[in-house]
Curated annotation (Swiss-Prot):
Source organism of the structure: Mesocricetus auratus
Name listed for the protein in its UniProt record: Nuclear factor 1 B-type
Family: Belongs to the CTF/NF-I family.
Asymmetric dimethylarginine PTM sites in chain numbering: R335, R388
GO BP terms: anterior commissure morphogenesis; chondrocyte differentiation; club cell differentiation; commissural neuron axon guidance; DNA replication; glial cell differentiation; lung ciliated cell differentiation; negative regulation of epithelial cell proliferation involved in lung morphogenesis
Motif extent (9aaTAD): 397-405
Ranges annotated as biased composition (Low complexity): 408-421
Subunit structure, interactors included: Binds DNA as a homodimer.
Record's compositionally biased regions (Polar residues): 324-340
Gene: NFIB
A Gene Ontology cellular-component term: cerebellar mossy fiber
Phosphothreonine modified-residue sites: T286
């Protein structure tokens, strides 16, 4: 696929633009520029264009050089790319090009949380809604800038407020539109000498001739032709319309909706972002695509060689399911596994930290983020209502991979967000752990409250909130697989315990408290025990107890199966 260098400059040469450019309809350039010309004429002369002048402008725009149209479309696609969230750009390309089942594509919201409006011709005083632009560009439907209220989202759309998927955007058709469609159809059949025109019963009444006046300058055949023709027509790159799959323009909302989807189609759930989106930041071109044999960006070379790259065995796919699941359906789990210290949406007044690791991905010769994740398989994660852990955690890893070492010589201040602050976008391998403890002079209480009626391998999830220190850490507990028990010793006299209203302390100077959990990097079943004989301090029938750890509890660790 070769494009004229006049059309695509170095800034506009991008896989996103090259993939979508052949699917932009030719009417888009003519329609947007015609509306701008009419608006400019009205502001200058304070009167509307005559039909002859408007028709002359239309003919001029239709006969414009293909390179000019292509350059305008490429600039508009570059602007749309910035307004689409980065994690949805690949899906947008694959769905528009017909290589993937249509799924929701979310855009960056405006300051009010609504869908954005952009100027399509570098005119600050004339803006169009993103969904309107998508319908005009990729469906060729001539809509006015005030037709936003006529747009409706498909029943398959899960986020109607911000979705800009062209296949999910439909135009509501009213009774007047249906009546006009019938009238125009009868007019065309009469002009073409159809036999039905000779039937008086099927001829439109005479009063309809004076009831409608065509205000536009496009006739029906011309409008349909330019709405189906790609904008790259005439540049040596012709794409048959039949090869571009799309949903029908008209959809009867009163008819039954078939919600069944193909079994081979991937789910439409996407991983949300945990960091605020910088709207002015321009991401790297390599941060948008993950090449696959069916993807437009299949290879590290130029876009023209993607046909040769189709046979490459390397497959890069985006994860179709988040690594972690959240209790709230609205608050999906983030990619990064270290949470900031805030209140959990499902449990008021409670925050928690998660320790997780990911194995580094294999090296790839492609200049794209190497975060290949297989499609969803039967889950072997640990069962937890709040936290899910990857199944590839290595049980042979020692605790030093999960618990940071503490250096008293390095001063640290206790800040609210220092314990679990997300550190930017990490596309590849990362090993987030709990942040080091604050300065030794600062008190670091860890409140653990649980209900335990079984041995140390099981416990029931419970939470408590501490309103004293901002450096407090809260840990959620839940039953775990009893395999791979790990024990952690605590410093002498670094703990106190509240058992049914009674405060317990170390009995002797050799009394050292230990805690037990299972699987590296997971918090579960924290039960105090005596290190000397490894017996639980509390009997099995104790209902409630709290454990306060003050200072730096993590000193040494030993593993026992």
């Amino acid at each position: 696929m070769m494009y004229s260098p006049i059309c695509l400059t170095q800034d506009e040469f991008h896989p996103f633009i090259e993939a979508l450019l052949p699917h932009v309809r030719a009417i888009a350039y003519t329609w947007f520029n015609l509306q701008a010309r009419k608006r400019k004429y009205f502001k200058k002369h304070e009167k509307r264009m005559s039909k002859d002048e408007e028709r002359a402008v239309k003919d001029e725009l239709l006969s414009e050089k293909p390179e000019i149209k292509q350059k305008w479309a490429s600039r508009l696609l570059a602007k749309l790319r910035k307004d689409i969230r980065q994690e949805y750009r690949e899906d947008f390309v694959l769905t528009v090009t017909g290589k993937k089942h249509p799924c929701c594509v979310l855009s960056n919201p405006d300051q009010k949380g609504k869908i954005r409006r952009i100027d399509c011709l570098r005119q600050a005083d004339k803006v169009w809604r993103l969904d309107l632009v998508m319908v005009i560009l990729f469906k060729g439907i001539p809509l006015e800038s005030t037709d936003g209220e006529r747009l409706m989202k498909s029943p398959h759309c899960t986020n109607p407020a911000l979705c800009v998927q062209p296949h999910h955007i439909t135009v509501s058709v009213k009774e007047l539109d249906l009546f006009l469609a019938y009238y125009v159809q009868e007019q065309d059949s009469g002009q073409s000498g159809s036999p039905s025109h000779n039937d008086p019963a099927k001829n439109p009444p005479g009063y309809l001739e004076d009831s409608f006046v065509k205000s536009g300058v496009f006739n029906v055949s011309e409008l349909v032709r330019v709405s189906r023709t790609p904008i790259t027509q005439g540049t040596g790159v012709n794409f048959p319309i039949g090869e571009i799959p799309s949903q029908p323009y008209y959809h009867d909302m009163n008819s039954g909706v078939n919600l069944q989807r193909s079994l081979s189609s991937p789910p439409s759930s996407k991983r949300p972002k945990t960091i605020s989106i910088d709207e002015n930041m321009e991401p790297s071109p390599t941060g948008d695509f993950y090449p696959s044999p069916n993807s437009p960006a299949a290879g590290s070379r130029t876009w023209h060689e993607r046909d040769q790259d189709m046979s490459s065995p390397t497959t890069m796919k985006k994860p179709e399911k988040p690594l972690f699941s959240s209790t709230s359906p609205q608050d999906s789990s983030p990619r990064l596994s270290t949470f900031p210290q805030h209140h959990h949406p499902g449990i008021p007044g409670v925050a928690h930290s998660v320790i997780s690791t990911r194995t580094p991905p294999p090296p790839s010769p492609l200049p794209f983020p190497t975060q290949a994740i297989l499609p969803p398989a039967p889950s072997s994660y640990f069962s937890h209502p709040t936290i899910r852990y990857p199944p590839h955690l290595n049980p042979q890893d020692t605790l030093k991979n999960y618990v940071p070492s503490y250096d008293p010589s390095s001063p640290q201040t206790s800040q609210p967000n220092s314990s679990g602050q997300v550190v930017g976008k990490v596309p590849g391998h990362f090993t987030p752990v709990l942040a080091p403890s604050p300065h030794p002079s600062a008190v670091r209480p860890v409140t653990l409250t649980m209900t335990d009626t079984k041995p140390i391998t099981t416990s029931t999830e419970a939470y408590t909130a501490s309103g004293t220190s901002q450096a407090s850490r809260y840990v959620g507990l839940n039953p775990r697989d009893p395999s791979f028990l790990h024990q952690q010793q605590l410093r002498i006299c670094d703990w106190t315990m509240n058992q049914n209203g009674r405060h317990l302390y170390p009995s002797t100077s050799e009394d050292t408290l230990g805690i037990t959990w299972q699987s590296p990097g997971t918090w579960a079943s924290l039960v105090p025990f005596q290190v000397s004989n490894r017996t639980p301090i509390l009997p099995a029938n104790v209902q409630n107890y709290g454990l306060n750890i003050i200072g730096e509890p993590f000193l040494q660790a030993e593993t026992s199966n």
